[in-house]
């Protein structure tokens, strides 16, 4: 190992460019990138109990709400530039798993969030994209639900980090009005 380090040092002193030097520089870039990872979702890291409130039919005019419990565990991935949220949802008639996958783009300074429902393992939702301001994150996407063009909005509110909240809302009139159809209240598990 000392001979390799000596070779790299002598090569660099002579001004020659080596693959080993590229590897060292690449590792330095990775380390620098990981040090500057975003902290927007740090509040979500850990294990939570979740209270859900959801419209029975998401695009319906009826306002019949269902309430149920769940749990969630979130951990960082991608050197802090992403996180993975593993959920268990206990609907009134059945339980299932789902995952939220989040990644941060340092060039746009925006997050993308994908939802994968365990009941439909071959379909991942269109990502919502957005950012946090003053501990509130707004994320948007355009999708087609029940053959209706629909704007989707996720809102993450971390102003109370010990009790963060998430909401989903849909708009079928191009964002003029929004109908909140699902909310989650998180409480850190013991």
Give the label of every model feature segment.
Residues 2-11:
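Bacterial N-terminal signal peptides
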Residues 1-2, 19:
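Initiator methionine at the very start of the polypeptide chain
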Residues 17-190:
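Hydrophobic small-molecule pocket/channel-lining residues, especially in calycin-type beta-barrels
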């Amino acid at each position: 190992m000392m001979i390799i380090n000596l070779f790299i040092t002598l090569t660099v002193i002579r001004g020659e460019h080596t693959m080993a030097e590229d590897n060292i520089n690449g590792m330095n870039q990775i380390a620098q990138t990981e040090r500057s990872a975003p902290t927007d979702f740090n509040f979500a890291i850990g294990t939570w109990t979740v209270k859900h409130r959801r419209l029975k039919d998401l695009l319906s005019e009826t306002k019949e709400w269902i309430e149920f419990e769940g749990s969630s565990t979130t951990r960082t991935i991608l050197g802090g530039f992403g996180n993975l949220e593993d959920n268990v949802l206990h609907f009134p008639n059945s339980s299932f798993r789902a995952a939220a996958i989040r990644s941060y783009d340092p060039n746009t300074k925006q997050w993308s969030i994908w939802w994968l429902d365990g009941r439909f393992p071959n379909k991942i939702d269109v990502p919502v994209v957005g950012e946090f301001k003053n501990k509130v994150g707004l994320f948007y996407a355009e999708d087609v639900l029940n053959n209706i063009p629909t704007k989707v909005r996720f809102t993450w509110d971390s102003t109370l980090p010990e009790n963060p909240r998430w909401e989903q809302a849909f708009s079928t009139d191009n964002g003029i009005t929004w109908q909140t159809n699902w909310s989650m209240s998180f409480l850190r598990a013991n």
